[in-house]
């Protein structure tokens, strides 16, 4: 389970992260990250988007639980100002926690590589 202090709950945070954040797509999910300028709430914040396209309520809740569990594994890699949104794709209904963990780490690696390249002034 993802501790409450790390959960993203405000719609404005979700919207800002998805619209202005860096995106990395994987087969089962899309990861959006944004480094927040605000210092109000400590710790990285993680939000989930699991739409009806994934399946019925039972399937969506199962996917959400697996994603929350997998998200715990990336918390130590995040800065306290990071905001992360994980969007489950329809294919995620068949994915297990280990596959989610692998895809989250891969997506985070891609985003970190992209932001480091952008900071150094090289084209991305």
Curated annotation (Swiss-Prot):
Is this entry keyworded Iron-sulfur? no
Reported EC number(s) for this entry are 3.1.26.5
The catalysed reaction is:
Endonucleolytic cleavage of RNA, removing 5'-extranucleotides from tRNA precursor
A Gene Ontology BP annotation from the UniProt entry: tRNA 5'-leader removal
- Per its UniProt record, what Gene3D superfamilies does this chain match? 3.30.230.10
Task: Name the source's superkingdom.
Answer: Bacteria
Alphabetical GO CC annotations of the entry are: ribonuclease P complex
Identify this protein by name.
Ribonuclease P protein component
- Which gene is annotated as encoding this protein in its UniProt record? rnpA
